[in-house]
Amino acid sequence: MEDLLAYLARALVDDPDAVEVEGFEEDDGTVVYELTVADDDVGKIIGRHGRTVNALRTVMRACAARDGRRVLLDVVD
């Protein structure tokens, strides 16, 4: 799933080399993905009124739901 998130994020930003995805699992089984992009690209990832980041979160949740897991996406600035 990290690869999917990185692929989608790289398609949205101007500096795809700066995209980094780090995933870790919390005690309750929730997988948290931290997405790091260049400072100039944070707005592109978040989108107008958060629509783009919400769409990314929805895609990640749909992928995780197949496995019965819970996923969170944080954009690190």
Predicted regions and their residues:
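RNA-contacting regions in translation and RNA-metabolism proteins
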Residues: 1-42, 52-77
